[in-house]
Amino acid sequence: MKVLKFGGTSVGSAQRMKEVAKLITDGERKIVVLSAMSGTTNTLVEISDYLYKKNPEGANEIINKLESKYRQHIDELFATPEYKQKGLELIKSHFDYIRSYTKDLFTLFEEKVVLAQGELISTAMMNYYLQECGVKSVLLPALEYMRTDKNAEPDPVYIKAVSYTHLRAHETAANLV
């Protein structure tokens, strides 16, 4: 089974996501790994900086701008009302989650959670797009199988075991995103 990784520029717009979808839907089973859409991680770092400086108003302003950008991507990516709605609900959920960190203490742990949202959003968007196109795909959120050890290094034994379980559970899917 192939593992294909696409960086932020490759999935930086709705059109680019559609092009990636064409590349990965060749009928061969594969795992697809996506970065956050171009510019997203930098913006999430900016949001985190505002939160470290205890400036929730500044953070919320940037969050709102990024959410608006994603709403536009949803509108451009999906053709059907059903998937546009799913996409909008996805965006709302993630951005509400990011906003929840503007109300409380912000530490390195919270920063890592905020920074992970870009990849989580792009992979979920791609999975919905593939489903809308009739491609059998399954979303495997990295947070379900990634774990670090006491030194904050990846725990390869755990990751391998849980990843294998996920792969076996979804043997009939053409693409695992």
Regions found by a protein language model. Give the residues of each.
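Nucleotide/pyrophosphate-binding catalytic subdomain
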Residues: 1-177
